């Protein structure tokens, strides 16, 4: 059968044209017929033109790889035609000449394709050459697991806070509302830059960075510069004065008092007033030391109880001499000295944990021995790794199980907050990544069902918060605490407080008591036997590496004085400034007037000096949210972290702040304990907490792991006791005084006053959006109840170990305890309200307040008050005024009493005549009165 020839395609023509470039014209003429026949046979075997294009491109690349400058040379046909062909006289081209011209034309069309092909070939060759070169950042992977890459990522991003089981529903984001309001907001004046200030205060501080001044209390006569007057061991004094005893602070004057105030008090008060003031200060110092500071002086009975309860440190007692102690410390300069297993050492090396910290050196060998531990160290000293490393090491030697039913949950780690539990979970997973140890995270805010599924597999380590753990113990099938061998409590002093007391007792009762090891860790750990005895500890070992309640060595503590004025408040009205509608005479110089100045001082710091990587601690969730709105309206990127947010929002806020997406993190004390957020440079305390432990945990978010850090605290008149305690517990080089120019603070007050309507509008719109979401949720809930009623009611009811009233009472007790830590004045006497004032000023202030209260009562009653009542109040005021002490040297004014004089005259006449009392009775009878 005759095969029909197909017409040559365009690809075949391009191939022929490419072939013609590599052969001479003579050879092409000689082999014209065979070549055409061969091409015809080749064309008959093709299926499509697309394959021909790919093959042609590869063929052209192979033929022209040797000629590097073929693209820049002129066309070969133009050079060969004059030598090997002759043009007829009539100017007509021959058949072969026309073919060569057509081929040259086709080559011109495909020149771009050939250029790209040759260029890609050249680039690929260059890439191969670059790949063979040695990278300057090349590192040998010793273990072959890519651990160096993992460490680089961990160093850049910190601990991984991502968790599973979150509810990815649409969230209410106030940032969208703020951005919408900000677009229509008029342009606000820019804050005064530090470089452009021309005030006299800044001219004196040009040699100091960031307006930082040493607290030179005794050398400064200016009231604006004087901060902590009377304290002799503050920075700026001589070296000998720096080494004075810290106990001298208790006998000195108020740190916030000034020379001018002291002089006026000396002029106005008498000796009795001075004695009363000194007695009052002494009583307040005694109360402060008893309520806020653990007494260093222990009675013999307390020492005996602690000696009987605690066991001796075996490492400390084994070092009989200083040389042996030194050799022991040298031997424990690396984790290899603890005889840890290879997977644990491998993980520590990948995390760049080479040398153990002091708390780790003392804790790991004792924990490996299975002893109970009560440990304390400063913030950022590696306490989490101190209990996680020995725990994982002990689990590596456990008996291997063949089936999941034989697995046991052996370790329970408790944390007071969800974020701290998530961080412990991340640290544990990183240290145990080369082992087969399984972890389970049980915290509130995440899916209960996913946690139940993980607990059914009986993971070796369970990290939980107390509330969710009790929920799983009572309501999750096949999960118990009967096999717990190691119980760890992070931030144990918080777990021992009243808010967690009932839950902690329930957990301890569920855990076995026989061979259980218990370890307690905290930066402010207590050694009170009465609190620790309920945890069923067995001769625990006390490991307090650092002095009690001290800050990190590289932490600089700055204090900004807050002065009260007669202003009426700033943005946010009641919530933000803390001011209600009060007369100026009442709020002038008072506590609420100080609260009105705090937002302006805070924004002055955040817009001028600390512009990134700054954590700001406030005392309430409402204040944190309102400050976030103010920051957003001013164009400052800020996140918030408190209990009113969902768990997804809390994790997102932490992650954004850690990754640098937000510059500020406004948080309550929810984030003050245990969190290790990478890159925190500054911590700002919007107000001073009422207890020193809370202050230590707040400022401990910076200056961690030997890094530098700075803590700035806004201090008012009522915070002087906490200020004195902070000065006493810190070294001289750590305390500094920061002065914010009054012009900057006044400018920021004006800005906040302009923002007040916008803040109210954002809050109002957010409230409306929240109401709509609640309505939608209730509607969806009703639909689910109607469509899936049988399934919903068939679910078993979840139980709790407390009744509803007991749970409410425990919640109220926890809230009261937190408020007591935030404001020590709530439980103090009434005289603390006028602390720091002389007797004359105190009485004047009391009188002004009484007058204002009477004025309010008079206006509120609207004339209903009787005249007798008004006269009674006037009489009370007159009596109080008469009892006020007078100045020395002024004799009291004696007024003649006419009635008393007449009576004395009548009595004198009878006595002169020798009469008696009977005569006076007759005189009365003669006067007309009836005798009885």
Curated annotation (Swiss-Prot):
Organism the protein comes from: Mycosarcoma maydis
Keyword set includes Lipoprotein: no
Any one biological process term the GO annotation gives: rRNA processing
Keywords linked to the UniProt accession: ATP-binding, Helicase, Hydrolase, Nucleotide-binding, Nucleus, Ribosome biogenesis, RNA-binding
Ranges of compositional bias, category Basic and acidic residues: 56-75, 847-858
Molecular function via GO: ATP binding; ATP hydrolysis activity; RNA binding; RNA helicase activity
Principal place of residence: nucleus
Residue numbers spanned by region Disordered: 1-107, 183-334, 812-932
Biased composition (Polar residues): 913-926
PANTHER family to which the protein is assigned, alphabetical: ATP-DEPENDENT RNA HELICASE DBPA, ATP-DEPENDENT RNA HELICASE RHLE-RELATED
General function of this protein: ATP-binding RNA helicase involved in ribosome assembly.
Domain comment in the entry: The Q motif is unique to and characteristic of the DEAD box family of RNA helicases and controls ATP binding and hydrolysis.
Record-stated family: Belongs to the DEAD box helicase family. DDX27/DRS1 subfamily.
Residue ranges of every copy of the Helicase C-terminal domain listed in the record: 601-748
InterPro entries, per database record: DEAD/DEAH_box_helicase_dom, DEAD_box_RNA_helicase, Helicase_ATP-bd, Helicase_C-like, P-loop_NTPase, RNA-helicase_DEAD-box_CS, RNA_helicase_DEAD_Q_motif
UniProt motif (Q motif) ranges: 333-361
Chemical reaction(s) catalysed: ATP + H2O = ADP + phosphate + H(+)
The protein, known as: ATP-dependent RNA helicase DRS1
Positions contributing to ATP binding: 377-384
Subunit organization: Associates with pre-ribosomal particles.
GO cellular component: nucleolus; preribosome, large subunit precursor
Biased composition (Acidic residues): 192-210, 242-253, 262-299
